[in-house]
Amino acid sequence: MKDVQLVIDELVKWLREKVKAAGAKGVVFGLSGGVDSAVVAGICKLAFPSNALGIIMPCHSHPEDEEHARLVAESLDLDIEIVDLTPTFDTMMRSFTIDKSRMAAANVKPRLRMTTLYYYAQNLGYLVVGGSNKSEFTVGYFTKHGD
């Protein structure tokens, strides 16, 4: 348990240093309802108790995901915004005139989330914190310019 606390303390310190160096006031991150985003939320809340914002961004998502994200936010007393990206995604998909591959369509969602996070960050003077983990990097599971 000591080692875990040490890692948490180092991450909190690192986040504070990065935010200060950027002249920012806090952090914003996606809150999906999954384990990775819950860990990010907890660390961000420790680093910035009053300036951490979780964005819940459903897009053809399971209702349980939003419920889990809300439970995480509630347990951490975390400020949240909910931005339903479903209508935006659907409008984009309808407007494309070329055949749509499943992979290309699937990659639109993380890019919409990224755009949303940076919108909030710029308006609030915050930095975006990502939730990628080592195993995702190891296997190459990510979307270029995604969240």
Q: Which positions does each model-derived feature cover?
A:
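Gly/Ser/Thr-rich active-site loops/lids in small-molecule metabolic enzymes
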Residues: G146-D147
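ATP-dependent adenylation/nucleotidyltransferase module used to activate substrates
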Residues: M1-T143
